[in-house]
Regions:
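Conserved GNAT acetyl-CoA-binding A-motif
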Residues: 128-140
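Short amphipathic alpha-helix that is part of the acyltransferase structural core
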Residues: 22-57
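Acyl-donor-binding surface of acyltransferase catalytic domains
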Residues: 1-29, 34
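Short acidic/polar active-site loop segments enriched in Thr and Asp
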Residues: 75, 134, 158
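Conserved acetyl-CoA-binding loop of GNAT-fold acetyltransferases
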Residues: 151-162
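Conserved acetyl-CoA pyrophosphate-binding loop and the N-cap/start of the following alpha-helix
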Residues: 111, 115-123
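Conserved beta-strand-loop-alpha-helix junction that forms the acyl-donor binding cleft
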Residues: 112, 138-148, 165-170
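A conserved beta-strand-loop-helix scaffold within acyl/acetyltransferase catalytic domains
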Residues: 58-60, 69-76, 80-99, 103-107
Length: 170
């Protein structure tokens, strides 16, 4: 049995287009994961992704995770309140094109609905441009959180492509 998924590709081409969402609480801070910690990325990927059918990395070995995250063009940031983990984003920089892909982005379930998503996405976009990108892009789909697309659009990103894909039912 299979179904269909709507996938949207979004971009923002200037930091001036960003509609920034301010930090909802003063105790929040963003931390670059350095050195890379594949266990942390793996944790976020599995915890956030389990409700949204993130499956492409489920078969990755620890070596796959480590190799990917130790690439010089991959960066991970974690949002924390005090020492509690809230969410994360992964960036892949394509230096030859001066582009950055926000490859993965998400908030842990217990923090959804508390206004962290808009702030975290604002920070992801700003960090992407701070590294010299001329274009930041992301893709989302109808399996992602119901407010994911709205968040991207609310931050000033524009849809540049859509597609429908067939997926096997869970």
């Amino acid at each position: 049995m299979s179904g269909q998924v709507e996938r949207s590709y979004l971009e923002i081409k200037s930091i001036n287009e960003l509609i920034e969402k301010n930090k909802p609480f003063n105790d929040l801070y963003l931390e670059k994961v350095n050195p890379p910690d594949f266990q942390l990325n793996k944790f976020f990927y599995k915890e956030i992704g389990k409700k949204h059918r993130w499956i492409d990395r489920l078969t990755w070995s620890d070596r796959n995770w480590s190799d990917y995250l130790n690439s010089s063009n991959v960066k991970t940031y974690v949002l924390k309140e005090n020492e509690d983990l809230i969410g994360f984003f992964e960036q892949i920089f394509y230096n030859d094109k001066l582009e950055c892909e926000i490859a993965y982005f998400g908030i842990l379930e217990e923090y959804i609905g508390k206004k962290f998503g808009g702030y975290l996405l604002s920070e992801a976009i700003k960090k992407s441009f701070n590294f010299g990108s001329k274009r930041v892009w992301v893709h989302t789909c109808s399996l992602d959180h119901k407010h994911a697309l709205k968040n991207y659009l609310s931050r000033g990103m524009k849809i540049y492509s859509t597609e429908t894909a067939k997926v096997k039912s869970a």
